[in-house]
Amino acid sequence: FGGFTGARKSARKLANQ
């Protein structure tokens, strides 16, 4: 669902840091 996708996007953003 949307929440899962958002969490994945956030995790990717953190990894990019």
Curated annotation (Swiss-Prot):
- Quote a single Gene Ontology cellular component term: synapse
Q: Name one GO biological process term.
A: neuropeptide signaling pathway
Q: Which keywords are on file for this protein?
A: Neuropeptide, Neurotransmitter, Opioid peptide, Secreted
**GO MF annotation, one:** opioid peptide activity
Q: What is its main location?
A: secreted
Per UniProt, subcellular location reads as: Secreted
UniProt keyword Secreted, yes or no: yes
Q: Does this entry carry the keyword Secreted?
A: yes
- Report the transmembrane regions from the record: none
Provide the function of this protein: Ligand of the opioid receptor-like receptor OPRL1. It may act as a transmitter in the brain by modulating nociceptive and locomotor behavior. May be involved in neuronal differentiation and development. When administered intracerebroventricularly into mice, this peptide induces hyperalgesia and decreases locomotor activity.
Q: Which family, according to UniProt? A: Belongs to the opioid neuropeptide precursor family.
Q: What is this protein called?
A: Nociceptin
Question: What gene is behind this protein?
Answer: PNOC
